[in-house]
């Protein structure tokens, strides 16, 4: 997955740090509210809401905050209405970037996203320019130190996964599943006594672009800047960056 595992771990650590600052709460409240508005307030009947609540619990968001966000989404409480938007563009070295955002002011958000891309050597593109490069998948990471490959593959295949990858350069096994099966497969793996270090529905690139040196540094700074934006929920990119450069981005 050419660095996807490493970046997923970095994002996970940063989410924990952001949780201490309360920053991640704002983004999760938006996600919970929108999920509840679109699919109803019952997480048992709304998979997207269930995943959003799990993310909120991972960073210790108070249950009262979660309930209020759901009620704002269902209209039981007054609140801001957020609209989902997707921006597509390019980073240094021609890297494809897909940005998922939630905003109450599309004009403001697109202007700020365009500025961030330009500032870090990228550019905003037209709708559809890079989305074809990405596939929506469930993505699970398991630390190699916790289980041997044969045992994991046996459990994973029985759970109905699409693929198990063992990149010698990565610290984790990577498990690919359909988005709808993510929670089910995660539960099966954990019930088999195998700890899951990361699980999320994501957009996986079909191909990667190798960048290094100044382009790699600019790309990582751009990813940080985009993910730090209050309206941005997720950023996906198809970069392949050397391990030493990637390590500099760690918390």
Swiss-Prot record:
Keywords: Cytoplasm, DNA-binding, Transcription, Transcription regulation. The keyword Transcription regulation applies. One of its GO terms (biological process) is regulation of DNA-templated transcription. InterPro entries: Integrase-like_N, TACO1_YebC-like_2nd/3rd_dom, TACO1_YebC_N, Transcrip_reg_TACO1-like, Transcrip_reg_TACO1-like_dom3, YebC-like. It comes from the Bacteria. Belongs to the TACO1 family. HAMAP family: Transcrip_reg_TACO1. PANTHER family: TRANSCRIPTIONAL REGULATORY PROTEIN YEBC-RELATED, TRANSLATIONAL ACTIVATOR OF CYTOCHROME C OXIDASE 1. This is Probable transcriptional regulatory protein THEYE_A1868. It is found in: Cytoplasm. The keyword Transcription regulation applies. One of its GO terms (cellular component) is cytosol. Pfam families: TACO1_YebC_N, Transcrip_reg. One of its GO terms (molecular function) is DNA binding.
């Amino acid at each position: 997955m050419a660095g996807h595992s490493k970046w997923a771990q970095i994002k996970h650590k940063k989410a924990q740090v952001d949780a201490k600052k309360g920053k991640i709460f704002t983004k999760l409240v938006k996600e919970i509210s929108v999920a509840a508005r679109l699919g109803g307030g019952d997480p048992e009947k709304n998979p997207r809401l269930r995943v959003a609540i799990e993310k909120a619990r991972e960073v210790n968001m108070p249950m009262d905050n979660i309930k209020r966000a759901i009620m704002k989404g269902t209209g039981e409480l007054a609140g801001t209405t957020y609209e989902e938007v997707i921006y597509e563009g390019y980073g240094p070295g021609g890297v494809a970037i897909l940005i998922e955002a939630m905003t109450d002011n599309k004009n403001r958000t697109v202007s700020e996203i365009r500025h961030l891309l330009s500032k870090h050597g990228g550019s905003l593109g037209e709708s559809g320019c890079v989305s074809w490069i990405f596939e929506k998948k469930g993505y699970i990471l398991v630390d190699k130190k916790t289980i041997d490959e044969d045992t994991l593959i046996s459990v994973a295949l029985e759970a109905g996964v699409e693929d198990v990858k063992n990149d010698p350069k990565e610290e984790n096994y990577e498990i690919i599943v359909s988005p709808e099966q993510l929670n089910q497969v995660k539960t099966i793996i954990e019930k088999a006594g195998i700890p899951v270090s990361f699980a999320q529905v994501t957009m996986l690139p079909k191909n990667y672009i190798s960048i290094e040196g100044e382009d790699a540094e600019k790309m990582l700074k751009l990813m940080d800047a985009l993910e730090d934006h209050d309206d941005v929920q997720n950023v996906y990119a198809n970069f392949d960056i050397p391990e030493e450069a990637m390590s500099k981005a760690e918390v």
